[in-house]
Amino acid sequence: MSSQQQKQPCTPPPQLQQQQVKQPCQPPPQEPCIPKTKEPCHPKVPEPCHPKVPEPCQPKVPEPCHPKVPEPCPSIVTPAPAQQKTKQK
């Protein structure tokens, strides 16, 4: 009986030791991987976003908006009174 008891406690210690060695090996490679992806992501997003948005948005919006609004306005107002004159005749 004593021989069986000695075998049981002997088998679990080696298994636990193997698992402990594998666990610390896995986290180190994962840790350096996370910061690497964050570093290139942050600088790439703000750099192209800021210069691209204000440059094309500001010049394109005010230029085509101002000339388009006054042009169609007078053309629509002129036919309105013209039609009224023909009806009065």
Curated annotation (Swiss-Prot):
Cleaved signal peptide residues: none
Major localisation: cytoplasm
GO molecular function annotation: structural molecule activity
Region (6 X 8 AA approximate tandem repeats) residue spans: 31-78
Segments of this protein annotated with the region 2 X 12 AA approximate repeats: 3-29
Sequence repeat copies, ranges: 3-14, 18-29, 31-38, 39-46, 47-54, 55-62, 63-70, 71-78
Region Disordered, residue ranges: 1-29
Record keyword rRNA-binding present: no
Protein keywords: Cytoplasm, Keratinization, Repeat
PTM comment, free text: The N-terminus is blocked.
Protein's recorded name: Cornifin-B
